């Protein structure tokens, strides 16, 4: 009632019309509950059902971890990566695509392309991309580019290609690091080529960087079927790392049963 009085004082014309309508039609302010059913009062009206539409098409964009850091790669680089992968089975079309699209990339885009190809284990395409980079005016010999490619080839059991890059790297007066030596030695031992593994080992001893422990551990384990070669590596290991121990297998300690 207080609100009605305040309203009537502020809006006298509106209030007079409003009260006249109430007096003429008293039914508008009366609410009848007699016609309502108990079921309606006790149970609320359920909401109308709705349908959710789920898209079942693929929009063609790369999904998931395949394109990690995709936002950091430019559109031109993404286009080149997709084109290289699409044409990798056709050498003629691939060479044409490289001439028309890859060579016009900027430096950062080229580096992004080779990095993404290596991450996706497209080593053959990464090597082609590396050959393009070597022809650029801004290219300088980079041991890390060689390292990534050689390690990828060694893990893929493509030792001939790995050693071809190895020789190119040495011609540019670059030296592998411990991880590169380790993966190449492990690759040759896995392929059953202990002589090639020992050649890489001898090259490691001549490196200007001091050798690390891991390549020796890989050789000591992989040369168990070749005791003469293993004893030589073990002797060098004990001289270079006197505080370390080269553990022999039980049959060498206690003798064969």
Swiss-Prot record:
InterPro entries (UniProt xref):
Pentatricopeptide_rpt (IPR002885), THA8L-like (IPR044795), TPR-like_helical_dom_sf (IPR011990)
Cellular localisation: Plastid, Chloroplast
> What Pfam families would the database entry show?
PPR_2 (PF13041)
Task: Name the reported effect of residue 186 to E.
Answer: Reduced RNA binding
Mutating residue 206 to E: effect? Reduced RNA binding
The record, for Gene3D superfamilies, names: Tetratricopeptide repeat domain
Q: What is the name listed in the Swiss-Prot or TrEMBL entry for this protein? A: Protein THYLAKOID ASSEMBLY 8-like, chloroplastic
- Quote the annotated effect of residue 104 to E: Abolished RNA binding
Q: Where is the transit peptide?
A: 1-55
Alphabetized, the UniProt keywords read: Chloroplast, Plastid, Repeat, RNA-binding, Transit peptide
């Amino acid at each position: 009632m207080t609100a009605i009085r305040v309203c009537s004082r502020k809006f006298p014309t509106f209030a007079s019309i409003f009260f006249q309508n109430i007096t003429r039609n008293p039914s508008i302010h009366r609410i009848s509950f007699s016609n309502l059913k108990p079921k309606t009062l006790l149970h609320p009206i359920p909401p109308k059902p709705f349908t959710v539409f789920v898209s079942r098409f693929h929009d063609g964009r790369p999904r998931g971890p395949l394109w990690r850091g995709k936002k950091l790669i430019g559109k031109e680089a993404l286009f080149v990566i997709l084109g290289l992968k699409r044409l990798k089975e056709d050498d003629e079309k691939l060479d044409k695509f490289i001439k028309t699209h890859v060579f016009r990339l900027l430096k950062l885009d080229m580096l992004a392309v080779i990095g993404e190809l290596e991450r996706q284990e497209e080593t053959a395409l990464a090597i082609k991309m590396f050959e393009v980079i070597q022809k650029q005016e801004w290219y300088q010999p980079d041991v890390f580019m060689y390292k990534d490619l050689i390690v990828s080839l060694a893990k893929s059991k493509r030792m001939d290609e790995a050693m071809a890059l190895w020789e190119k790297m040495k011609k540019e007066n670059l030296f592998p690091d411990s991880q590169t030596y380790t993966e190449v030695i492990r690759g040759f031992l896995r392929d059953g080529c202990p002589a090639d593994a020992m050649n890489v080992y001898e090259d490691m001893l001549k490196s200007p960087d001091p050798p690390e422990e891991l390549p020796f551990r890989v050789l000591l384990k992989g040369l168990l079927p070749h005791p003469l070669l293993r004893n030589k590596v073990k002797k060098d290991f004990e001289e270079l790392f006197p505080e370390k121990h080269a553990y022999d297998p039980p049959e060498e300690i206690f003798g064969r049963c």
